[in-house]
């Protein structure tokens, strides 16, 4: 299968760059797959999992927390709000972090502190839902 160039970029770093066969992307209007010579496209992403196939045998999976995707003749670029390799995630740790965030919401005496704790909890719930754990 022909390859195309793909880059996954988070605010911290270039997460992945290279020639790939396909990338499955969680678009806000639905999941879509990009192959070589895909029509140009610019879209937003919802929290979800990106599947990157370098070859039939080599698959990379990342959780992304929203962002933008651009398909051009040069390839696919994803600018993600956050990108985490799936193998680095632990379901028990995510559940514990959700519980901690909910306790922080209950304990907060200032609206701003409560809002930040709720935002953290919501991000963790999105992660859990995207991973279906």
Curated annotation (Swiss-Prot):
Where does this protein chiefly localize?
A: membrane
Quote a single Gene Ontology cellular component term: proton-transporting ATP synthase complex
Family annotation (InterPro entries)? ATP_synth_F1_dsu/esu, ATP_synth_F1_dsu/esu_N, ATPsynth_dsu/esu_N
This protein's membrane topology, according to the annotation, is: Peripheral membrane protein
Q: Where does it reside? A: Cell inner membrane
Q: Can you tell me where the transmembrane regions are?
A: none
Subunit structure, interactors included: F-type ATPases have 2 components, CF(1) - the catalytic core - and CF(0) - the membrane proton channel. CF(1) has five subunits: alpha(3), beta(3), gamma(1), delta(1), epsilon(1). CF(0) has three main subunits: a, b and c.
Q: What does this protein do?
A: Produces ATP from ADP in the presence of a proton gradient across the membrane.
Q: What is this protein called?
A: ATP synthase epsilon chain
Q: Which species is listed as the source?
A: Methylocella silvestris (strain DSM 15510 / CIP 108128 / LMG 27833 / NCIMB 13906 / BL2)
Q: Which gene is this protein's source?
A: atpC
